[in-house]
């Protein structure tokens, strides 16, 4: 029925394209009409359209004319030289109808999927121009600085011709320049540059003049699937060195390495013994039928199953798994031990290991044997695995009648510190084990210049400056024997998901979005529209070639490279990691094939390598770095030879990455071909393929070196990729649900902070904080006044110590009501505040000679005090939230929903944060002591203040230096 309706009415995509096609015709009509205008008359269209928008016309109404103007300008610029990256290029682009379709979709808030080479960069100019007519901030987000600079210089020339201003944000731009850039009508930059400026404006700036942004109206995100999906789990973080250095990584690194060594040696011994039994059968296609031999083979495979749980990448294990029948037997034991009725046998078998590694879920678990080895043989402590029961410890202290209240408090502090140290040690131990067992050099990271540099799993690019969180980076530094740096402390953080939700309007463009359309719809309310190509794609997509073993696969790849190389075709070989790219490079050198390698270790030569990758006979081995945003241009001889030949050495876990690699060839009508070579030992097949795979392998086992190719295998691959994508989507959605809680708190704090920065009269803001503190104190006093263990005298003692007021007990008891008591305390505090700061203001006025300047100085002092405490308490709160996030998952053991628990407890933490901020501010204001000095500078500068604020619990008098002309005596 649904198929019939689709055939009758068309799919939703077809209906949308049909509706937009009418607008395309209107745009083309406007373009023809504007052809008769002079250049000056066409330029005047911009202020005219702006005025019409101000007069109430909608952007939708202005769209045909605005897009027609842009198309006409592109036509007029034809043949004009434009300077791009220091070189002059002739303008040769006029939007096609399909590009106008994409531009309409972007203005309407769609993600447009346009194939490689279809001109996404030019397409974006039209919605950028239209939305810039509003005068509101319009941003084009790219994936790197080079593309931002290039697009601003190249297609930005159209916007500048029409009288709009353009700016580009690149890393290293100074703050004063950034502010000017943000004033431009259209700003180009990367997601991280826009995001970090948002964080700096809301967490680092201490005066409104230091803020650079001007809001978030409309953004187009280039390669939107990369930004909002691949990078979604990586938050933007502004951090600094932590206050304390955790020595546990240095102390435990050798012990952890020793424990991992014991595990490796034990697994190697088991594997070697198993191979002695299996060696005679590795070269045969059919296993013997003798019962005793079959039992011996089965036991050897059982032993290798155990090895797979201790060292999944063991070489003997990998070699044995090349045999389909032996592989099936190992997997049969896996099914056996995962059955519920065999659970005890499984646990008994696994208990012989020191560590159980779960490669599928990227996790591990220390066994009792491993803990015993750690304590008895390696020199660890039993306390490393046992956390303190703080409730029990505190109860014991309270029950001790020999202790005074002060002693009890000191004991509790000591126990708390001991618990913190023990948790830090246990956490460090776990991260060191993770670094050794799950993090692989040249796959997850590289070592360069005494530093650990992360490799982006999606792009293959090195991520200099980025560090693994929660101490994992320090653990890897310890593992690789490089300098162990301090753990950083987070000052401000936001995920890209929540950052881009700040924009009123959001659109995107990419070549690969349709596979993630569900996620874009559910999380961002963005719909994907596939735009037709201008020219038919001539790419030949060969069927995937499946091989039994990795060894056979590489032999086939080399043979294919040699064959294609002889024909003169340029070849791009895509690999999944630095390790694989270097391995393939060694094989090519052995076969005397000249080639270049592009990976995270030599990314500095990327532009040069890519420039030569399209020449006839070129062979380029690359990681995913060459997969996205890379334009490989062919010379004439290469086109004649058949175009670029893309060879994939494995399938990525994401179908989008495979499509990106394929998309490097056959752009804009060029010829090209793509083929993937796979083995059943590839990680994707090994961990995520269907259980039916073993049966298929046993039935379709081809001769040595011969490929298998069948639609059934293609479906298996797609199923495995969908399974991984589904799991990753669940993780991203789960992460976002937690971050949404943090996001609401972040917005509240940033709004409070901005109110302080932009307030004209900080005395009003300070008095508001005093009133809030008075209300909190009233609640506390009345709560304790009605309790059996009345501690009203203690509260009053603390109050008189912290603030210059003394409460009247009788008056409080007479009032009895929270609001009345709050008004009473508030009046006392505000009166004391007025006395203190009126005297300060009078003193400043006398010295400076200007009441207005003195008022400004006092405002600066109050603003700095308030901002400093907001920032300090927020940093502490971020740490508390991270700890809560890491611990709340354990609540599921008690049949509680961790997310609900997180929301409830984070709300309590946030209430405490607001209370602590207000109390800290008010305490500091009353504790403030100032001494005034005058600078000897002869110039008659405007009076300014230099202040240094200290923690309010350990404050020292601040010195204000008034800069001005010395008074004559």
Curated annotation (Swiss-Prot):
Which coarse location class describes where this protein primarily resides? Answer: membrane
**Keyword Protein transport listed:** yes
Q: Which Pfam families match?
A: P-loop_SecA, SecA_DEAD, SecA_PP_bind, SecA_SW
Q: What is its EC number?
A: 7.4.2.8
InterPro entries to which the protein is assigned, alphabetical: Helicase_ATP-bd, Helicase_C-like, P-loop_NTPase, SecA, SecA_CS, SecA_DEAD, SecA_motor_DEAD, SecA_preprotein_X-link_dom
What is this protein for, i.e. what is its function?
Part of the Sec protein translocase complex. Interacts with the SecYEG preprotein conducting channel. Has a central role in coupling the hydrolysis of ATP to the transfer of proteins into and across the cell membrane, serving as an ATP-driven molecular motor driving the stepwise translocation of polypeptide chains across the membrane.
State the signal peptide span. Answer: none
Q: Classify the protein's membrane topology as the record does.
A: Peripheral membrane protein
EC class of this enzyme? Answer: translocase
Q: Which family does it belong to?
A: Belongs to the SecA family.
**What organism is listed for this UniProt entry?**
Chlamydia trachomatis serovar D (strain ATCC VR-885 / DSM 19411 / UW-3/Cx)
Residues that hold ATP according to the record = 99, 117-121, 631
The encoding gene: secA
Q: Which GO terms describe its cellular component?
A: cell envelope Sec protein transport complex; cytoplasm; plasma membrane
Q: What is this protein called?
A: Protein translocase subunit SecA
GO biological process terms, alphabetically, are: intracellular protein transmembrane transport; protein import; protein targeting; protein transport by the Sec complex
Q: Which SMART domains match?
A: SecA_DEAD, SecA_PP_bind
Tell me, how does this one assemble?
A: Monomer and homodimer. Part of the essential Sec protein translocation apparatus which comprises SecA, SecYEG and auxiliary proteins SecDF. Other proteins may also be involved.
Q: Which HAMAP family match?
A: SecA (MF_01382)
Keywords annotated in UniProt:
ATP-binding, Cell inner membrane, Cell membrane, Cytoplasm, Membrane, Nucleotide-binding, Protein transport, Translocase, Translocation, Transport
């Amino acid at each position: 029925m649904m198929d019939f309706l689709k055939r009758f009415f068309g799919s939703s995509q077809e209906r949308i394209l049909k509706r937009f096609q009418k607008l395309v015709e209107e745009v083309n009509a406007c373009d023809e009409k504007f052809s008769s205008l002079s250049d000056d008359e066409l330029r005047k269209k911009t202020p005219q359209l702006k005025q019409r928008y101000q007069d109430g016309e909608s952007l939708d109404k202005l769209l045909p004319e605005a897009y027609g103007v842009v198309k006409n300008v592109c036509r007029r610029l034809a043949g004009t030289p434009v300077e791009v990256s220091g070189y002059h290029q002739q303008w040769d682009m006029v939007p096609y109808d399909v590009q106008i379709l994409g531009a309409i979709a972007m203005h309407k808030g769609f993600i447009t999927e346009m194939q490689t080479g279809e001109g996404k960069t030019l397409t974006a100019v039209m919605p950028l121009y239209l939305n810039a007519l509003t005068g509101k901030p319009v941003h084009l987000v790219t994936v790197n600085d080079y593309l931002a600079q290039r697009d601003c210089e190249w297609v930005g020339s159209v916007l500048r011709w029409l009288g709009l201003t353009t700016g580009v944000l690149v890393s290293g731009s100074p703050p004063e320049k950034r502010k000017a850039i943000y004033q431009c009508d259209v700003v180009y930059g990367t997601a991280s540059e826009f995001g970090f400026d948002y964080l700096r404006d809301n967490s680092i700036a201490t005066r409104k003049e230091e803020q650079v942004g001007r809001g978030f109206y409309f953004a187009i995100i280039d390669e939107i699937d990369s930004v909002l999906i691949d990078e979604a789990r990586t938050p933007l973080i502004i951090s600094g060195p932590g206050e304390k250095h955790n020595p546990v990584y240095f102390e435990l690194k050798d012990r952890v390495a020793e424990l991992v060594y014991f595990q490796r040696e034990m697994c190697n011994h088991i594997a070697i013994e198993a191979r002695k039994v299996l060696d005679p059968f590795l070269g045969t296609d059919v296993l013997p039928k003798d019962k005793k031999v079959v039992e011996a083979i089965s036991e050897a495979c059982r032993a290798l199953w155990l090895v797979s749980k201790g060292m999944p990448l063991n070489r003997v294990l990998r070699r044995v798994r090349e045999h389909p029948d032996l592989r099936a037997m190992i997997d049969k034991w896996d099914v056996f031990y995962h059955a519920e009725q065999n659970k005890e046998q499984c646990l008994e078998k696994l208990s012989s290991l020191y560590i159980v590694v779960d490669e599928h879920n990227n996790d591990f678990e220390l066994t009792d044997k491993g803990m015993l080895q750690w304590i008895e043989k390696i020199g660890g402590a039993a306390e490393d695995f046992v956390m303190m029961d703080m409730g029990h410890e505190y109860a014991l202290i309270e029950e001790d009648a020999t202790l005074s209240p002060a002693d009890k408090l000191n004991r509790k502090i000591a126990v708390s510190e001991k618990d913190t140290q023990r948790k830090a040690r246990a956490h460090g131990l776990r991260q060191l084990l993770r670094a050794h067992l799950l993090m692989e050099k040249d796959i997850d990271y590289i070592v360069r210049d005494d530093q650990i540099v992360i490799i982006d799993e999606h792009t293959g690019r090195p991520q200099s400056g980025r560090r693994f969180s929660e101490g994992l980076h320090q653990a890897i530094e310890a593992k690789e024997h490089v300098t162990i740096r301090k753990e950083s402390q987070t000052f401000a953080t936001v995920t890209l998901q929540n950052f881009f939700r700040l924009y009123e309007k959001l659109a995107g463009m990419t070549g690969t979005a349709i596979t993630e359309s569900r996620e874009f719809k559910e999380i961002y309310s963005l719909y994907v529209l596939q735009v037709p190509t201008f020219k038919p794609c001539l790419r030949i997509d060969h069927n995937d070639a499946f091989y039994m073993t990795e060894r056979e696969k590489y032999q086939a790849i080399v043979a294919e490279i040699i064959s294609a190389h002889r024909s003169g075709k340029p070849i791009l070989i895509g690999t999944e990691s630095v390790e694989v790219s270097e391995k393939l490079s060694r094989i090519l050198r052995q076969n005397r094939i000249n080639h270049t390698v592009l990976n995270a270790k030599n990314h500095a030569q990327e532009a040069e390598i890519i420039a030569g990758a399209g020449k006839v006979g070129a062979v380029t081995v690359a990681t995913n770095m060459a997969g996205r945003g890379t334009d490989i241009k062919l010379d004439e001889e290469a086109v004649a030879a058949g175009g670029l030949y893309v060879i994939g050495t494995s399938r990525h876990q994401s179908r989008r990455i495979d499509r990106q690699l394929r998309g490097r060839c056959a752009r804009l009508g060029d010829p090209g071909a793509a083929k993937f070579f796979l083995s059943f030992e590839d990680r994707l097949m090994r961990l995520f393929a269907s259980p039916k795979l073993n049966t298929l392998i046993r039935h379709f086992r081809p001769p040595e070196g011969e490929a298998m190719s069948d639609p059934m295998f293609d479906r298996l691959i797609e199923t495995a990729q969908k399974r991984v994508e589904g799991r990753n989507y669940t993780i991203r959605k789960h992460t976002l649900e937690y971050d949404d809680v943090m996001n609401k708190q972040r917005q509240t704090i940033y709004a409070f902070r901005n109110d302080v920065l932009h307030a004209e009269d900080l005395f009003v803001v300070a008095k508001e904080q005093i009133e809030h503190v008075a209300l909190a104190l009233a609640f506390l006093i009345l709560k304790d006044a009605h309790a059996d263990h009345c501690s009203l005298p203690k509260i009053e003692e603390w109050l008189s110590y912290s603030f210059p007021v003394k409460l009247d007990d009788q008056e409080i008891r007479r009032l009895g009501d929270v609001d009345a008591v709050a008004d009473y305390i508030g009046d006392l505090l505000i009166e004391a505040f007025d006395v203190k700061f009126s005297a300060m203001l009078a003193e400043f006025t006398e010295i400076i000679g200007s009441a207005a300047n003195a008022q400004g100085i006092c405002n600066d002092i109050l603003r700095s005090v308030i901002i400093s405490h907001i920032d300090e308490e927020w940093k502490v709160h971020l740490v508390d939230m991270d700890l809560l996030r890491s611990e709340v998952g354990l609540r599921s053991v008690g049949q509680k929903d961790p997310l609900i628990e997180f929301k409830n407890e984070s709300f309590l933490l946030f209430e405490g944060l607001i209370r602590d901020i207000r109390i800290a501010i008010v305490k500091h204001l009353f504790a403030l002591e100032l001494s005034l000095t005058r600078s000897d500078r002869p110039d008659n500068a405007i009076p300014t203040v230099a202040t240094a604020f200290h923690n309010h619990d350990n404050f020292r008098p601040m010195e204000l230096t008034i800069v001005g002309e010395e008074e004559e005596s």
